[in-house]
């Protein structure tokens, strides 16, 4: 029930990664990267499908060898989500995965080879209508830039990025996006700010090597949140030393928190105190797990008492306000019913699923009317 965030998106050009539009006002795409051995086709396919189930728009796969390229061919045949091939050092691998239908090439022109090899990759990408991501990383800056700046700085990352952008410009290739990642939040944020002023290509956001599930999510939320709130960013990845599925969940949580893009349920829950009339924490944890399959955007508030419960319920799709033995249920800001505190989880799950179905049907009818 909350309005969309008043964020003015940075204007950028439009590219497509598979069937996913990137830039020029398109929804911010959420992506992750597999951490299986690419040559283990079964494990990689299973992980990609798990990422698809939680909403991944794009998945990146490392392709370090020709054997991995042959495995990529088989993987591509078995999944639906667009795949980005992560290529370093050997330009021939990029040419090979292009034959196999890759949706995007992630390369670093600085380590892919000489001018002729870069031209061959770009010509192949142009012929097959494959976009490229230029991936600059503070941990792998060119040696001359390391010597010039002494350490990674925003100016160093910008210079590296512009060097590669200019290279593609000279080759008359404009179907690309750019990232300037760093593990330090301030370094990454300032680098992206500088880059956003220099080019109009789409930007892929990320705080690289952010850390484990908890600390990495915090760093990413701060860094990506700052940039997104300024309208910067067209795709994003939350980099975690954790299950890649968690990267997608955190990515959508960041977008939901900024009211930029919603997928699934946005739970609003109190941290609990002695006033709670039912087990709020247990209820929220159980519902988050049970309702992962719901993709309908909804705000659901679960508050343990009447101090803040009614106020949150007024601006929620569904809201529960704790009461003695029974708690008030609100729908679209109107009190509708009372739920037994001892059976809260099952009752609330049923109500949420019913509301999601109702909203989906209403949207389907709206779409049909527009199409008429």
Curated annotation (Swiss-Prot):
UniProt keyword list: 4Fe-4S, Iron, Iron-sulfur, Isoprene biosynthesis, Metal-binding, Oxidoreductase
EC number: 1.17.7.3
Listed SUPFAM superfamilies: Dihydropteroate synthetase-like (SSF51717), Nitrite and sulphite reductase 4Fe-4S domain-like (SSF56014)
Cofactor(s) essential for the protein: [4Fe-4S] cluster
UniProt GO BP: isopentenyl diphosphate biosynthetic process, methylerythritol 4-phosphate pathway; terpenoid biosynthetic process
Enzyme class: oxidoreductase
Family: Belongs to the IspG family.
Role description: Converts 2C-methyl-D-erythritol 2,4-cyclodiphosphate (ME-2,4cPP) into 1-hydroxy-2-methyl-2-(E)-butenyl 4-diphosphate.
Name recorded for this polypeptide: 4-hydroxy-3-methylbut-2-en-1-yl diphosphate synthase (flavodoxin)
Organism: Shigella sonnei (strain Ss046)
């Amino acid at each position: 029930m909350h309005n969309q965030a008043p964020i003015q998106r940075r204007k950028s050009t439009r590219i497509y990664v598979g069937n996913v539009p990137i830039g020029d006002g398109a929804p911010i795409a959420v992506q992750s990267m597999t951490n299986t051995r690419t040559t283990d086709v079964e494990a990689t396919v299973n992980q990609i499908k798990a990422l698809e189930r939680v909403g991944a728009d794009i998945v990146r796969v490392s392709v370090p060898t020709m054997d991995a390229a042959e495995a990529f061919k088989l993987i591509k045949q078995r999944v639906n989500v667009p795949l980005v091939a992560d290529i370093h050092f050997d330009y021939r691998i990029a040419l090979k995965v292009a034959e196999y239908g890759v949706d995007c090439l992630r390369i670093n022109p600085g380590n892919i080879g000489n001018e002729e090899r870069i031209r061959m990759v770009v010509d192949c990408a142009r012929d097959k209508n494959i976009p490229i991501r230029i991936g600059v990383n503070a941990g792998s800056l060119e040696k001359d830039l390391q010597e010039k700046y002494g350490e990674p700085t925003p100016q160093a990352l910008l210079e590296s990025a512009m060097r590669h952008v200019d290279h593609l410009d000279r080759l008359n290739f404009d179907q690309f996006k750019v990232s300037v990642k760093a593990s330090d939040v301030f370094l990454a944020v300032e680098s992206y700010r500088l880059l956003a002023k220099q080019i109009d290509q789409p930007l892929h956001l990320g705080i690289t090597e952010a850390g484990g599930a908890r600390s990495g999510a915090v760093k990413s939320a701060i860094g990506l949140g700052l940039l997104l709130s300024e309208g910067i960013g067209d795709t994003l990845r939350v980099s975690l030393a954790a299950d890649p599925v968690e990267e997608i969940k955190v990515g959508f949580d960041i977008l939901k928190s900024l009211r930029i893009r919603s997928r699934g349920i946005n739970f609003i829950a109190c941290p609990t105190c002695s006033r709670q009339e039912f087990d709020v924490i247990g209820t929220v944890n159980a519902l988050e797990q049970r309702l992962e399959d719901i993709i309908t955007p909804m705000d659901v508030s679960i508050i343990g008492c009447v101090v803040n419960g009614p106020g949150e319920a007024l601006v929620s799709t569904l809201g529960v306000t704790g009461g003695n033995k029974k708690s008030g249920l609100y729908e679209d800001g109107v009190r509708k019913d009372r739920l037994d505190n001892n059976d809260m989880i099952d009752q609330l799950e049923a109500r949420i699923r019913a509301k999601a179905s109702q909203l989906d049907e209403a949207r389907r009818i709206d779409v049909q009317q527009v199409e008429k």
